[in-house]
Amino acid sequence: EELAGFVASALPLIFSPNTKEISKPPLSIEISQAVSFIEDHYDSKISLTDIADYVGLSSSYLCRVFKEETGVNINTYINNLRMAKAVRLLEDKNYYIKEVAISVGFDDQLYFSRLFKKYYGVTPSQYRAAVK
């Protein structure tokens, strides 16, 4: 009876929408440095070698540990960041699509548009029109 009462009182807490997710452990120093490097340089060409040299790890080891700690590979992380920045810039009607692409590190507007559509299901122009 006591156990049933305990379970009944605990259920709302367990299924409460305010329950915090289990947090992931903090990133290692090297991966934190890699993330900072990417955030500081997302608007230019970033090579795996550049990041590995910056954090002092081999490229292959960096790739493995980065994925283990962040859950995504480095290229995906870079593209996720670039797409998030692009969305913000597209909401500002003062920039041409080409300028947005260049501002987030893409030299090729067509590739940028294809990747944007892959992420969001619409082209940058369609996205911009939808957020009027």
What name fits each language-model region?
Residues 1-36, 40, 49-50, 54-55, ...:
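Short, Lys/Arg-enriched, Trp-marked, Pro/Gly-tolerant hinge/linker segments that flank
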Residues 61-62, 66, 111-112, 116:
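Short hydrophobic/aromatic patch on the recognition helix
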Residues 35-36, 40, 45-49, 57, ...:
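Terminal helix-turn-helix DNA-binding modules in bacterial transcription factors
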Residues 114-132:
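…primarily DNA-binding HTH/wHTH and HhH modules…
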